[in-house]
Amino acid sequence: MAESGDSQQEIARPILALTMGDPCGVGPEIVAVSATRAETLASCRPIVVGSPEILREAAALWRVATQVVAFDSMDEAVRQASSDDPTVRPSSERILCVRTGPPFAEDSIRTGVLPAGKIDARGGDAAFCSVCTAAQAAIDGLVAGLVTAPLHKEAFHLAGHLYPGHTELLAQRCGVADFAMMLYLGHDETVRAPHGLAVVHVTLHTAMRNVVREMTQSAICEKTALVDHFMRRMGCERPRIALCAFNCHNGEGGLFGDEEQTTIRPAVERCVTQGLDATGPLSVDTIFVHARDGLYDAVVAMYHDQGHIALKLIGMHRAVNITLGLPIIRTSVAHGTAFDLAWRGPASGVRISSMLEAIRCATKLARTK
């Protein structure tokens, strides 16, 4: 018997866990607004993970007329999100929220109990608890993936959670050693490659003095293979991958460093023998111009800022942060907690475009498992 249109629609709308991030930052605001947007509800069934009280305060600040329904367990929330009854599922008038982290009273931000736009250990602990709960739900198969709002690394550490960031925490929780951070921009008038542009990083949250040591041939090949796999999931049959040089002017034949000759070029050759369409190393001052114009589908950056700065200049407000190599789907906004803008409401200039793109990307990945 053929499935009804409604049943097919539900299959196409995966359940996603949206973490609230650090409550002292913009996370609760962008989540409260994004979870009730029509484009979100048309593509997925969101469950927010964090403090219901903080979420209600954020919704009120942004004049989002919605009810926040609190749950003490993910199982409960998933059952309601999966219901055939439209009066209990997530909607523009109803946000499902699983309670995690330290308890906060109503109006904790307004009354100053929790400092808006400030580093606070309670904010770091709240972010940690929300992402751990969401990740476990994804590992257990309760949700199709998680979309994370930003945390603050110093607050994270003040709370005793000594991880460099989301990426490393999730890799540890999932028990994987081969993983990578990637930024992604979908196709539009600024990114001409038909399946968008991905930038993966060989090294990540490390001091510049450590990059050369960590930038091994094996690491380069692993990250290149990961971004190739991602772009294939996005519909690109044979991704064209460009690898960045490490030194200025591509090392100028060894005059400005020999990492291009001793490490990067041999890694590119190994990638080619493995069947990848890889080229490089290429000078960084032009590689991203060519990638933006559609010559490449993905770029492999050797270190954090080499990739982040270039991609964010192309499209910061719609970029998505994706963790590659995990057995679960994790996407995120590509910006931080924005303490300077947090809890000032719509007039602050806070944008939700990156969160909406992160939700859209997680939904697409969930459909291509």
Regions found by a protein language model. Name each.
Residues 2-259, 265-369:
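Anion-binding alpha/beta catalytic cores of soluble intermediary-metabolism enzymes, centered on
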